[in-house]
């Protein structure tokens, strides 16, 4: 398999305006990867709902702003597939199937679960969406048969 045939999948949560950290931490890498791989970059709006569910209007607005910023940073829709996660129903379908077969204690043992709860103590994160966040991440990766997944700390 050539590198051009290998697939990269990565997403970004629309939880505010992008800043220099996004450019240096992700977008410069994404821009370079699109020159040699089949790249799928998505607005992770369902991911944003797991912790920012009280302000859905901001998620929608930030999604549009973020995609415009991606374009300014060199993410080219002619070279990469750019999309909004919630507009692809198969994400929800696969996420649901993964929920049906994953024991809750496995999710409670995910190392970042308790760290994230501590870091976002100002929000009520006692919901299935937040607990099942790793399953949504899993669905994002396997639905596109990704070979590489550039990710952040979570």
Each predicted region: which residue ranges?
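Inter-helical turn/loop segments and adjacent helix faces that build the functional surface
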Residues: 145-153
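N-terminal Rossmann-like or analogous alpha/beta NTP/dinucleotide-binding catalytic cores
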Residues: 2-138
């Amino acid at each position: 398999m050539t590198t051009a045939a290998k697939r990269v999948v990565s997403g970004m949560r629309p939880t505010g305006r992008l800043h220099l950290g996004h450019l240096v931490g992700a977008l410069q890498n994404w821009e370079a990867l699109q020159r040699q791989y089949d790249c799928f970059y998505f607005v992770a709006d369902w991911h944003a709902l797991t912790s920012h569910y009280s302000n859905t209007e901001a998620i929608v607005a930030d999604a549009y702003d973020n995609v415009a910023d991606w374009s300014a940073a060199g993410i080219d829709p002619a070279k990469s597939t750019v999309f909004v996660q919630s507009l692809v129903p198969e994400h929800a379908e696969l996420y649901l199937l993964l929920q049906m077969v994953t024991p809750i204690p496995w999710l409670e043992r995910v190392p970042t679960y308790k760290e994230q709860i501590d870091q976002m103590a100002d929000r009520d994160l006692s919901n299935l969406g937040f607990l099942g966040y790793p399953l949504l991440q899993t669905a994002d990766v396997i639905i596109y048969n990704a070979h590489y997944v550039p990710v952040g700390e979570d």
